[in-house]
Amino acid sequence: MMLSVPTAFSLGPERRQEQFSTIPGYLVFPAPYVFPGIGEGLMLVGYSGNFLETTIDAYLVGFSGDAAGLVGSVDEVFVVPELIYFSGWKFNISKYGINSYSSRGMESEKDDFNIIVGNKFEMDIFKVSLSLFERRLEAALLSQSQYGESHKILDSKGNLLNEIDPPQTFQGKKEGIELQLDWTDDFKDPRTGLRLKSTYDLNTSEDADSPEYYLTSHGLTFYQPVFGESTWAFHFFRSDAKVRKEGYTDLKTALLAEGLNEENATSCSYAPTSQACAPYVNKAQNTINANRNGTAHPLGGQDRLRSYPGNRYQAAHTLFYGTELRWNFDTSTEVLDWYFFSDVLQALQATVFWEQGSVSEEAQDLGKITRSSYGGGLRLVGGSGNTYRFEISTGEEGAEMIVMFQYPWRGEM
């Protein structure tokens, strides 16, 4: 006999707590920042979970100093209780820097990058989600747009290499569909069960020179309960780009986009291996590969390959897998109420993890060259729905410290 959809979901692990909690929590703290090639200043971080005892979560980072601007988000704004909700993200930064490595793929060195600096970066993300069966099934539609201006190129130490005059503008738009099957005992803090999240995005071209491609990503996580109230998580992730329309693939055009003038771009297109031209040609080849093959979900940052900076490894295909032991050594319910922080403690958690990943331009080359991360940390699982993370991760290029407000392996945007 065929089971109905509600019956099939009811056979999964029983939810161990309310899935639409309204327990409030907040965190506010200032912190200095120093961004190579940009400058320094002060940022103020603010988070409010289940704002005013609703399901709404709000997050805001304000920057003062050389990188003035703000990053903010709101999540779980239900317009139909326990059924339909909105989420949104806003980025508005007056000065930014992006690391651009000498080559896509896995073979660039740690300091083999330039910093692309711009005076403006804006990004808006809007998502509407349908939630069913106590959040065991969620489907979402997503829209994202971004705009930026690049005006100079620095080396990895912050020294000026080239001025881009007039500034080079870039813009992009993405429309996506998300589907998540959550066959676990809790949506925000799972300890047993299985979770599958799939995304399907169309990155549209804003002009004739830009590529247009589909991006499919799938993340599968299995949670094995251990030590009573703890869990051992195993995660697999795959992301693939498929180009529908190529962008420009001409070397001279790509060199002009790197900031070279007409004369130098022409010279380097005829002598790409010369010592003076090679760095620019390598960067131009990155652009050509991106325009020809598209770009899958990158590796690096707080979500996957945590010992590497964000977007460290990029190509048309991505493979990632990892495991993480989450030991909840204190699960007593305690109210924490300080001036800068308030929440209900649900678990104090120690974690150790290992991760490995690979990217490549051709799918058959995935796994030929890999990079790994391993580390550990402490977490506080709050009743407001947030998981406050402090971790140290290390790998082939050194160590990274992570301070974050959600579990890893969740982001596919």
PLM features: residue spans?
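Transmembrane beta-strand segments of outer-membrane beta-barrel domains in Gram-negative
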Residues: P13-E14, Y96-T249
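Transmembrane beta-barrel strands of outer-membrane/channel proteins
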Residues: P32-V34, L44-G46, A58-S64, F86-S108, ...
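Gram-negative outer-membrane beta-barrel proteins
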Residues: P36-E40, L52-T54, D66-A68, V80-I84, ...
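Residue-level signature of outer-membrane beta-barrel architecture
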Residues: V34, S48-N50, E76-F78, L130-E134, ...
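Outer-membrane beta-barrel "beta-signal"
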Residues: I177, L378-L380, G398-M413
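Outer-membrane beta-barrel translocator/channel fold
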Residues: F63-S131, G158-L160, A233-P298, E397-Y407
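C-terminal outer-membrane beta-barrel translocator/porin domains of Gram-negative envelope proteins
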Residues: Q180, F187-D343
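Outer-membrane beta-barrel initiation region
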Residues: A8-G88, A140-L142, D165-R191, A296-R306, ...
